């Protein structure tokens, strides 16, 4: 793989020692998924303007983005299934958009795909395609653009995680979802100036903040105002469940499942 050929790649001692490194194969598959997701964002937004929405596709986009970077334990078969699901969403959305435009005598805007996939997707070919996309990005984008796109992707992932948590309370935020799609769609265009990207990022952070406040208020309504309490750090040999994360509804589910059991 050619990931480390570029001088400005962040290949520090942490990566060199394998502590924080990501398997190049996994990175390639992630690139493929991102390519399909940003194209799917394009057609989802076009369909939204035509009054067409799809909750299944919405859930697929949010769930894929929220777990894409945080979970590198996916097997290659799981990645293949994700790729095929997103590709099928993309294919159907593109066909529907073009049909609606044709029925309304409107010229359909096109977004050319760099990847060609069919029902018999070959995983090795997908890995090669992902590597080519990584190299292509490094050639076409300036260092500043790449860094800004990385910031955008972190924000996109963060919003998706917050949307999933919000959904656990049977709530949603369409403004945050479609703003996230607009941000993801911008990655389709290579000639966006850094200044414009900065303005878009700044605007999106405000929407994300509103989403965080919404989630915080719902948590208070559900569980009450957080209080400072003493927590024992003592341990004992016993059955226990180790939990991590910030989703209080998931924690509640664990506590209910272990209630009146011999588990700490």
Residue ranges and their predicted role:
Residues 1-264:
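Metallocofactor- and cofactor-centric catalytic cores in central/energy metabolism, strongly enriched
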